[in-house]
């Protein structure tokens, strides 16, 4: 998806040979179905961008709930949600309004989505300032439904370093449950 002003736009990348079927897109999401082959159950992946304006964020949550209603299959959603789930996901500057957090939590609950956790860096975004105005926040995350989690023996989300961007790279490592010969798959998503 094309950028809007200084924002980088959305991208979803996968390795050559992966069977990925496009479902839908907008300036705030890209939705695909991933078919691993070898009889593995297809699953859905959605790249998501939550509206940066807190007052407009309910529109983002409505979109996510609409996507949920369109297709009931194993589902993972990842990206910059522009929201946190708890106050410990933000360090510095002004506190978030508790109603904002509740709207995000309610949306994830309505969609049956669970945070996948992470290893490495605690925060995924930095405002680039120093001193008292420096703010670090976990805006980027991966969430999935139970059906998607049941497809894999192991799911690992890593927050990679913020080298060239104000957001960090999210890396997802999966170990399939279905195959006889256990193979490691590695997906990497980067905010563009």
Predicted region positions:
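A shared catalytic/ligand-binding motif for oxyanion handling
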Residues: 1-192
